[in-house]
From Swiss-Prot:
GO terms for cellular component: cytosolic large ribosomal subunit. The lineage of its organism: Bacteria, Bacillati, Actinomycetota, Actinomycetes, Mycobacteriales. It comes from Corynebacterium urealyticum (strain ATCC 43042 / DSM 7109). InterPro entries: Ribosomal_bL33, Ribosomal_bL33_CS, Ribosomal_bL33_sf, Ribosomal_zn-bd. This is Large ribosomal subunit protein bL33. One of its GO terms (biological process) is translation. Keywords: Ribonucleoprotein, Ribosomal protein. SUPFAM superfamilies: Zn-binding ribosomal proteins.
Length: 54
């Protein structure tokens, strides 16, 4: 199996509506659903939820 099949690169987009994104990798086997993480949005200047983009 190729490296990118199990752990693809995904974009996390801010739910604050600022358009800010983080780029990370995710393990599809352990987390098959869309992930949400609370991270810092420098445009909004606070911690907000970031959701996986497809």
């Amino acid at each position: 199996m190729a490296r990118n099949d199990i752990r693809p690169i995904i974009k996390l987009k801010s739910t604050a509506g600022t358009g800010y994104t983080y780029v990370t990798r995710k393990n599809k086997r352990n987390n098959p659903d869309r992930i949400t993480l609370k991270k810092y949005d420098p445009v909004a200047r606070k911690h907000v939820e970031f959701r996986e983009e497809r």
